[in-house]
Amino acid sequence: MLFRSLLSTAVLAVSLCTDNASAAKHGRFGQKARDAMNIAKRSANAVKHSLKIPVEDYQFLNNKTKPYRVESLPDVHFDLGEMYSGLVPIEKGNVSRSLFFVFQPTIGEPVDEITIWLNGGPGCSSLEAFLQENGRFVWQPGTYQPVENPYSWVNLTNVLWVDQPVGTGFSLGVPTATSEEEIAEDFVKFFKNWQQIFGIKNFKIYVTGESYAGRYVPYISAAFLDQNDTEHFNLKGALAYDPCIGQFDYVQEEAPVVPFVQKNNALFNFNASFLAELESIHEQCGYKDFIDQYLVFPASGVQPPKAMNWSDPTCDVYDIVNNAVLDPNPCFNPYEINEMCPILWDVLGFPTEVDYLPAGASIYFDRADVKRAMHAPNITWSECSVESVFVGGDGGPEQEGDYSANPIEHVLPQVIEGTNRVLIGNGDYDMVILTNGTLLSIQNMTWNGKLGFDTAPSTPINIDIPDLMYNEVFIENGYDPQGGQGVMGIQHYERGLMWAETFQSGHMQPQFQPRVSYRHLEWLLGRRDTL
């Protein structure tokens, strides 16, 4: 999950009561949450219900892993299967700096591979994805209780969710990082220690994530390649959804937002005069010329460095849009623009871009019984950290105190060239990282000897996976069984990089379009040649 301030300073001060000291802790990229929170070896189909696996058949249960085993979870009224969670130190013997993990081995035929998932933020817990995106069960906002996830990534592979960097979720330690290189160095140490506990060697490794993890994933993947150690770091591919890979505020948000509104105005409901005002800003601030020149195939050339002038709000068309849309739709969610009122109860306390918990409700992972069951430390858990996980002030390309270069400049090309199996995807209903902004970033990246894609993406993604989540309900109500979704996106592959545009999906693609995300993972793992 990726966060930034979407409201003007005046509106924040009045309606969210955010003081300057709090706002100064985070850059534009990460402030949003804090304002409110103060060809396959095997094939595997999506499944509705899994068979219970006897404990004696658990693949990774041994004397070292036994203390991490999770036997049950509160409010989960079905068998968890093989599951582990807890803390593993970054440096052996120093438990004061430890990362928290959840590990769910595949429920199918055993595979010698690990798929790592990282949420973004920066500072947002990967337990969000575990519980609401791609874990073995999901508890979505507005739903009564957890249910089995027929499109869980655990159907296909062994999945490891990690709260990182230090200061995120249940992880322990005082943040010290000012760069992605430091975070990747910590993760390399943690991951090797984790593998030694679980007796893992010579596994294929895939690194995945979303949002600000568009920075984590390439840097950690590149660090794995740099280890030159296939026993522990045999990187075979990477995936990043709605990722911060290029210049975030100008290229991935501000420049493409007006065309985005024009395309989706049935959801924004802006009148003709306001649309004309937006179009005028789009042209006068140079965004139209920038898109016309650089969002072309093949790439027209290296894009000039761009940065927003935050002292002059005239060209901050993104915030103008986000403020205005709250009038026709007070429950507008930039993570998924088709959401309308009411704001749904969310067991993680973050249903849209605002912190919301009804009276009498509790945050699931902050419950004492849940912490005990998951071997978690007795600290306050929040979906995103209140304090910054970087200590570089408001510097760096995203004003988060993270001074590393944007991934398109070096590490992402390195990972593509080192694996020839990288997927970058964007959801068309995401207004936090916009689809055309991500494409603009790709068109400014040189990999395997060429700049950008030569050809505009156009090949459809046809999803023939049936509806396994809700089919029983529809059948009970007299409807015919629901089949595949049909065309749900656009794919394009060149020189080791797969582009995937997902229709009707917001920022968290495994949550909003789980069948499409399942197909993406099949490709990443080498189970398919195309999407």
Swiss-Prot record:
Its EC number is 3.4.16.-. The active site is at residues 211, 430, 507. Monomer. Glycans are attached at residues 20, 63, 94, 155, 228, 271, 309, 378, 436, 444. Induction: In the following growth conditions: acidic pH, absence of nitrogen or carbon source. It comes from Aspergillus niger. Residues 26-52 form a propeptide. SUPFAM superfamilies: alpha/beta-Hydrolases (SSF53474). Residues 1-25 form the signal peptide. Gene3D superfamilies: alpha/beta hydrolase. One of its GO terms (molecular function) is serine-type carboxypeptidase activity. Pfam families: Peptidase_S10. InterPro entries: AB_hydrolase_fold (IPR029058), Peptidase_S10 (IPR001563), Ser_caboxypep_his_AS (IPR033124), Ser_caboxypep_ser_AS (IPR018202). Removes any amino acid from the C-terminus of a long peptide. Digests preferentially peptides containing a positively charged residue in P1' position, as well as arginine, lysine or phenylalanine in P1 position of ester substrate. Also catalyzes peptide synthesis. This is Serine-type carboxypeptidase F.
